[in-house]
Amino acid sequence: MTDTAPTDITTATDITTATGAATGTGRGPAATARGHAALAKTQVLIEALPWLSRFQGATIVIKYGGNAMTEPALRAAFAADIVFLRYSGLRVVVVHGGGPQITAHLARLGVESTFVGGLRVTTPETMDVVRMVLLGQVNRDVVGLVNDHGPFAVGLSGEDANLFTARRRPAIVDGQEVDVGLVGDIVEVRAETVDALLDSGKVPVVASVARGIDGGVYNVNADTAAAELAVALGATKLVVLTDVEGLYADWPTSDEVLSELSITELEQLLPTLAAGMIPKMEACRRAVRGGVPQAHVLDGRVPHAVLLEIFTDDGIGTLITPDRDTANRVAPAAPTAYSGGRP
């Protein structure tokens, strides 16, 4: 037998139909069905709730690069993610490089890019182009995309307020040091300016150049810069966007992605990694060893990858944690009124 509502009981459809007729809105049964279909979207919001509570007020440093920086749809999605995080009460810092853009601009000038030991040979003339592209093009583009949603992003470089100080770094080839010009290692971070911007509700967007201890200007690795800044800020998370799904268990034999590693497990794997992943995983290692509780490597080719990692139970990519916290991802419990949801 099919159950039906008693004739003396007003159903939800009756109320909706009557209300629509009375108000002229036309919200009849079809509108009700659409409303019920939209209920599925609430599950996404409910899943995000404990994570929103946990990370309210947390500082997150995101290294932005790869396809997420070059494909228009991914660039727009990334900017929307940043604004969503800001509205959700997180303190967000973006650190970027711009290797492909620098190479393209040098090519237009008829200058061939040369790399030694994975480092760009950076002459004074090349450094002029690096600064011009990173500060005048890439940084302004990122700031503009975020500010399409409101006056949030502020662009700066590692030179500003002596944010990053670097010393000259040689490349190592066959165990020998090779001079690669104005390439530096960060030796000091003064994060007061970034902290002040975060306190005022802004999103600092930082280009990866640094002032040298000798007064010069140096090209620094953006992955390293993001890690050093995360440590200096006492960040809760470092997120590194890449063009792969995460850290593979046994590439190229297998495409299985390691969802989580302890810092010790990562250090054991580092010597075996492909050259392109070493700077990114070394940045994660540096951040976690420096006190950042979590470091993530995410596939920047996935739209809204940052939101998927932070606000869903499963997450994506590879998570690096301290040795004391190697449990699988589990959604945090809802905060008590006393805790206020602080991480």
Curated annotation (Swiss-Prot):
Alphabetized CDD domains for the sequence: AAK_NAGK-C
Oxidoreductase found in the keyword field: no
GO annotation terms (biological process): arginine biosynthetic process via ornithine; L-arginine biosynthetic process
Annotated family: Belongs to the acetylglutamate kinase family. ArgB subfamily.
Protein name: Acetylglutamate kinase
Species in which this protein is naturally found: Frankia alni (strain DSM 45986 / CECT 9034 / ACN14a)
Sequence positions that bind substrate: 98-99, 120, 219
Functional summary from the UniProt entry: Catalyzes the ATP-dependent phosphorylation of N-acetyl-L-glutamate.
Keywords: Amino-acid biosynthesis, Arginine biosynthesis, ATP-binding, Cytoplasm, Kinase, Nucleotide-binding, Transferase
Major enzyme class: transferase
Pfam families the UniProt entry points to: AA_kinase (PF00696)
